[in-house]
Amino acid sequence: MFGQRLDTLGAMSSSVSSPSPETGKKILLAAPRGYCAGVDRAVETVERALEEYGAPIYVRKEIVHNRYVVDTLAEKGVIFVEEASEAPEGAHMVFSAHGVSPAVKEEAAAKNLQAIDAACPLVTKVHNEVKRFDKQGFHILFIGHEGHEEVEGTMGHSLDRTHLVDGIESIPGLPAFLADEPNLIWLSQTTLSVDETMEIVRELKKVYPQLQDPPSDDICYATQNRQVAVKAIAERCDLMIVVGSTNSSNSVRLVEVALQAGAKNAYLVDYAHQIDEAWLDGVQTIGISSGASVPEILVTGVLERLAGYGFDDVEEVTTAAEKIVFALPRVLRPAR
């Protein structure tokens, strides 16, 4: 297993390195970064399914939001489809780490698909909260990004009582009756910016003073701790490079967090070759992080490319240690 839990350390630690005396150029490497426990579980689920059942294995949507991971699995015999109905009758299908709605599971059952759910357990936790609060008669204000697979899957568990809040600007468009609704609670997508989410909550409470907080935070440990790690180095950086795909919510948020925390510039790249040499003009210190669905090999590629431009002194700045591991879906666990 590869995923690990993040427990904030009492003091930030770093590997000590001095800028090159010749160039003064330096890289600050944020830690933790990259794969989280939920992504580890999802990718290993697909790999184990290939070993157990052979190709092809069908996956609804992208198993995780990373181009390299998807392309690598496709080369091994994974077929990615938009909907369960696109898979042939009786095929093996894996649901992505982002979770699915009951309607998707019903669609898979109608085609007798051998479904394996690779949803991150932290996403499943939010699904269970939605179902519980729906059953208790609450209306739910769900903070998230419209069209994101996690949002669609989560809201599918309470179609009539869950209302999407996609940014502060969407608040005026919420149903008018919610102003008089006594049982009102907010929940959120797991991969949002912590600061942005709480800003939205503050605005919601101005409109809905009765709005209740959830019993626990929905933004996942990996998302939060990667943001903390970026904040720890951003102010020292002339440039921040985040490795991740444009459809990865948590990766995009890291770019935003870096800029808000003081980085002079920040870019998102899938691969090292996407780094534009012009970005490096006048730059002495570069910060590097990666989203929760990014394998470390892609970060290594970025470090190697930057070394070619004289950025060969690397200081890893660690703000937390990761120890969490999620078990595979039961059907793929080794027999005891």
From Swiss-Prot:
Binding site for isopentenyl diphosphate: H65, H98, H148, S248, S249, N250, S293
Positions of the UniProt region annotated as Disordered: 1-23
Keywords from the UniProt entry: 4Fe-4S, Iron, Iron-sulfur, Isoprene biosynthesis, Metal-binding, Oxidoreductase
Enzyme Commission numbers on file: 1.17.7.4
Cofactor: binding details: Binds 1 [4Fe-4S] cluster per subunit.
One Gene Ontology MF term: 4-hydroxy-3-methylbut-2-enyl diphosphate reductase activity
InterPro entries according to UniProt: LytB/IspH (IPR003451)
Listed cofactors: [4Fe-4S] cluster
Catalysed reactions listed for this entry: isopentenyl diphosphate + 2 oxidized [2Fe-2S]-[ferredoxin] + H2O = (2E)-4-hydroxy-3-methylbut-2-enyl diphosphate + 2 reduced [2Fe-2S]-[ferredoxin] + 2 H(+); dimethylallyl diphosphate + 2 oxidized [2Fe-2S]-[ferredoxin] + H2O = (2E)-4-hydroxy-3-methylbut-2-enyl diphosphate + 2 reduced [2Fe-2S]-[ferredoxin] + 2 H(+)
Gene3D superfamilies reported in the protein's UniProt record: 3.40.50.11270, 4-hydroxy-3-methylbut-2-enyl diphosphate reductase, catalytic domain (3.40.1010.20)
Residues annotated for dimethylallyl diphosphate binding in this entry: H65, H98, H148, S248, S249, N250, S293
Pathway per the UniProt entry: Isoprenoid biosynthesis; dimethylallyl diphosphate biosynthesis; dimethylallyl diphosphate from (2E)-4-hydroxy-3-methylbutenyl diphosphate: step 1/1; Isoprenoid biosynthesis; isopentenyl diphosphate biosynthesis via DXP pathway; isopentenyl diphosphate from 1-deoxy-D-xylulose 5-phosphate: step 6/6
Binding positions for (2E)-4-hydroxy-3-methylbut-2-enyl diphosphate per the UniProt entry: H65, H98, H148, T190, S248, S249, N250, S293
Pfam families the UniProt entry points to: LYTB
Keyword match Metal-binding: yes
A biological-process GO annotation: isopentenyl diphosphate biosynthetic process, methylerythritol 4-phosphate pathway
Superkingdom in the source lineage: Bacteria
Positions in coiled-coil regions: none
List of catalytic residues: E150 (proton donor)
Binding site for [4Fe-4S] cluster: C36, C120, C220
HAMAP family, per the entry: IspH
Main function: Catalyzes the conversion of 1-hydroxy-2-methyl-2-(E)-butenyl 4-diphosphate (HMBPP) into a mixture of isopentenyl diphosphate (IPP) and dimethylallyl diphosphate (DMAPP). Acts in the terminal step of the DOXP/MEP pathway for isoprenoid precursor biosynthesis.
Family (UniProt): Belongs to the IspH family.
Protein name listed in UniProt: 4-hydroxy-3-methylbut-2-enyl diphosphate reductase
Source organism per UniProt: Corynebacterium efficiens (strain DSM 44549 / YS-314 / AJ 12310 / JCM 11189 / NBRC 100395)
